[in-house]
A protein has these predicted regions:
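Short, Lys/Arg-enriched N-terminal segments with co-localized hydrophobic residues
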Residues: 26-31
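RNase H-like (RuvC/DEDD) metal-dependent nuclease/polynucleotide-processing core
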Residues: 32-38, 44-316
């Protein structure tokens, strides 16, 4: 990964958490007990059902423990994925395991969005707002229409753009003609993560806007299904059996490229190697990587620690 933000350097965990919130809150959290029995990493998709045969640009799940890796699992749509994730959480709770679940989409929008949309800086208020309005099924969803609805609540044009559907959506431009909407283009973490996409782009290769809009409602429902059992990093202290974390598999692009040279599907390699890297790290190193304060915008787990993660992924 090229480029780091000035607040993203490695620190001694004993000295307190890195404040990466853009100065919006002074309090800092020190993560303790950051040791997980099992790590599941999810490559999400906002598209329609991708069929029975494993393929790229679909939902994939990687699973690892300190002892070894499971074969990556192909999930053909979000309904299947949500059901499986619920089963895995139930299984971990029944077994008394600590489970880390990572998702490759942002858990929040740039500072100020939540307040403008919901009247609150609490990221979970946005999760609930989206979940109450998104219609989602294996072969269709209303993400583009919902983005247009959000845009109508803001001045000017935007902040969302790139209607990738066949039907024109009022207030969601197909091209970037945005102006006067008042939102920052990127989160602090995205200004540090060179090559990352913004949350506002709803369509196009590599765009994550649709993933956020279809993914956060699923996370909201899982939190509601398992009350008091799931902590969401970095918004909450990791003192519950299950942790949700935001990932960006491109942090491991080097080791993924090495694996892809031998064949296979890139998405499958990404979740397998990301899960392996986080499962193989020593507890104190994982605690250091989790030692972040970004209470409104969230953060990408492992940004600034790319070399360490790639070394762990190569352990096999």
């Amino acid at each position: 990964m090229e480029g780091t933000h000035e607040t993203g350097q490695k620190t001694d965990p004993a000295r307190g958490s890195r404040d990466l919130s853009g100065g919006t809150r002074a309090e800092r959290r020190v993560v303790t007990g950051a040791l997980f029995d099992r790590v599941l990493m999810v490559d999400w998709s906002s598209g329609n059902d991708t069929g029975p045969r494993p393929r790229k640009d679909a939902i994939w799940l990687g699973e690892s423990t300190a002892q070894g890796d499971a074969a990556p699992l192909y999930l053909r749509n979000r309904v299947v994925a949500e059901a499986l994730l619920g089963d895995r959480i139930s299984g971990a709770l029944a077994a008394g395991e600590r489970l880390m679940l990572g998702f490759d989409f942002p858990f929040a929008y740039p500072s100020g969005f939540g307040t403008a949309l919901t009247g609150s800086t609490d990221p979970f208020a946005v999760w609930a707002w989206l979940e109450a309005r998104l219609e989602d099924a294996p072969k269709s969803n209303t993400r583009f229409a919902l983005a247009g609805e959000v845009n109508r609540r803001f001045p000017g044009i935007g902040p969302f753009w790139f209607n990738g559907g066949k039907v024109d959506v009022p207030d969601l431009p197909r091209r970037d003609t945005r102006t006067g909407h008042g939102m920052t283009e990127r989160r602090v973490v995205e200004r540090a993560a060179k090559g990352s996409f913004t949350c506002w782009q709803m369509g196009g290769a590599g765009a994550v806007g649709g993933q956020v809009m279809t993914g956060l409602p699923v996370l909201h429902r899982l939190r509601a299904r398992f009350p008091g059992q799931i902590a969401v990093w970095p918004f909450e202290p990791l003192d519950r059996p299950v942790a949700f974390v935001e990932i960006w598999p491109s942090l491991l692009r080097g080791v993924v490229a090495e694996a892809l040279a031998e064949g296979g599907i890139k998405d499958a390699h990404q979740v397998r190697l990301t899960a392996r890297a986080l499962a193989r790290l020593a507890p104190e190193r994982l605690a250091a990587i989790l030692d972040v304060s970004a209470p409104e915008e969230g953060w990408i787990l492992g940004l600034g620690f790319e070399a360490e993660l790639q070394a762990a992924a190569r352990e096999g």
